[in-house]
Amino acid sequence: ILKKSDVVDAGALGFVLIIQGWLNSFQKSTKIQSHHLNISYEHSKIEALKKDIDFTITNKFCTECSIVGSNINRLELKEMVKNLGDSMVVAGTKDRVKIHIHTNTPAKLYKICSIYGKVVDRKVDDMTKQEHTVHHTGSSGISIVVDSGADIPEDYIDDIEVVPVRYSFGNQQHIDKVTQTSENFYKQMAIDSNHPKTSQPTPGDFSKIYNFISSHYDSIVSIHLSKKISGTYQSGVNAAKKIKVKNIEIIDSYNASVGLGLLAMYAVDLRRDGKSFNQIISMVKEKRDKTHVFLVLDDLKYIVKGGRLPAKIKTIADLFRLRPVIGTKNEGQLKARGVLWGRSNMESKFANFLGSKINNNFNYRIMIAHANSLKKGNRLLELLLKKHTNIKEHYLVELGGALGAHSGPQALSIGIQEIN
């Protein structure tokens, strides 16, 4: 039946072709040429087949981890996690168990696993992003990449590939914005004696993303945290040297958080408008000088614990009831950009401070990020929109762990970008 239907066992055929190639090489001392293989296919048929296949993904994240413990009850563990998703595999010994599952709630999985021992080797892949990359449509062969130090609204997240930043509370490891919600991150930060420590993506993390993208796109524009804040940019540069792709550019954003997010969104807009690879690079680099991020903290103890501020500065600020405004300056260096006096009405005082940064002769796109302080974020947005009619686009998002590890709960960050 298979022969009549012109169906071939692809694996077996591939093995036969390998053997044939070896024989030709040994017997004739000739290099194997692709035309010897006599393989062809009709591209239109492949594309038609892809359209006929249902790629609906019920559970978004391909999630893996290992549990290191003693006397791990694998049957009980299976019962605990089986309702979290599908494609579940639980295997190992009583001292070490490996889990694979497709789920929408990696954080729940890891929380259950922590009951049985130390959770290590965490890995989470967003399958919807992978599907979007594989089946992207349109004339653009340009992929936009950021690290998770960028805070980005839902409207844009599907159009951007993200290399994750990791953080840990003591021995408890997390993947930023994946294995723990921002809300739970700030709740834990407020009560955990272990201050969260962030770790930049490694060149290996970048290589994994770049290699996958390069099989589906011709060009990559990768925009990252300021190199004066993090080594993330350099990791991207190192990984890019080993990637086989037609065009790749690693850009220092001079920014963080929502500032970096705004630049990534701008790059997506340019791609949608049909701009070329070189045009996107040039225009993003020009726009980064017109994109600024500002951050006001509710409590300076977190930035002191994170090593970004001397303890004596906190002592002085607390004594005089001051709240410094921190922002990027000098091509991405975090610096004090101003001071808010008093502890009350932070949003109103911050809005007044930002008024001096918004020029009435230009239009703006802004994005506010809140650290488990949605009410404050909405209030700040309301004040700015009321006062500045030249704010043409606005977004409100949660502040991720990359910057939140230093800002602490109740902080507010804003990105301001001049637009045409």
List PLM regions with ranges:
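Active-site cofactor/cluster-binding pocket
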Residues: 201-236, 240
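Mixed-charge interfacial surface used for oligomerization/domain docking
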Residues: 1-96, 130, 137-141, 149-168, ...
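A generic structural motif
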Residues: 95-103
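N-terminal glycine-rich anion-binding loop in soluble enzyme alpha/beta folds
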Residues: 143-205
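N-terminal accessory regions of nucleic-acid-interacting proteins
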Residues: 120-126, 130, 134
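Glycine/charged-rich beta-loop-alpha catalytic/anionic-binding loops adjacent to active sites
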Residues: 188-192, 217-222, 241-253, 396
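Charge-rich, low-aromatic oligomerization/scaffolding segments with amphipathic character
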Residues: 105-122
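Short beta-strand segments
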Residues: 18-19, 146, 222-226, 252, ...
